[in-house]
Amino acid sequence: ANQGGGATILPGRPMTAFAVLRLARSLMKRQDGGFIPDRLIFQDSAAIAWWVPPGMRRIWFRCPEDQLVAGERSEVVSHPGLVFCVTTARKWFVWAIKGAARPKDSTRLFRAPYFNVWESGQICVGNVDLPERATAEKLDEWTSAFFDSWFTHPNVHSNLVRYRGGAYRFWRDMLDGKHVVFPERTLVDLDRTLGEALQSRGAKHDN
């Protein structure tokens, strides 16, 4: 209160993207409708982003035989925590994070260690059959579309992972079962936070 006994409005501060989402969650819980998935971490009129915790998933490779021993290989391997983002322009991004905690706007991002992903994190979709819409109800379909596709070649030709022998050697060892738990030390720091990436939608969109 001020000296006259009236209320005083203090200086405010801009809301972060995550603060907006928390407010939206609070308001939507008071209304009838569908549930908000726990893995949804951001949504506005231009994009939606969600988190996939670290865990075991099958991955598929179709590469030259001299790179992964066989032309086609598929194994269940460990994966790091991931954040996916799809924009209304259907630009699709993926970034890696360390640990198993739900990401916040201050969470540091790392390069997703996968083939067919550009430096910005944008996924090269090729002929992947994508869901028609990017909505909260479709998150599992988008995640499955990523992991059920063939990984064919690195779009980042150096520094995809920090691993002796490079990306092909890394994934050959992963497929051979040499790392039961995903080796987070191999992830390349992108020197940016999740909040920064979501504000810029990946900084640039690769064609």
Q: Model segments located where?
A:
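Compact alpha/beta protein-protein interaction domains typified by the UBC
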Residues: 1-133
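Domain-scale recognition of soluble eukaryotic interaction modules
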Residues: 106-207
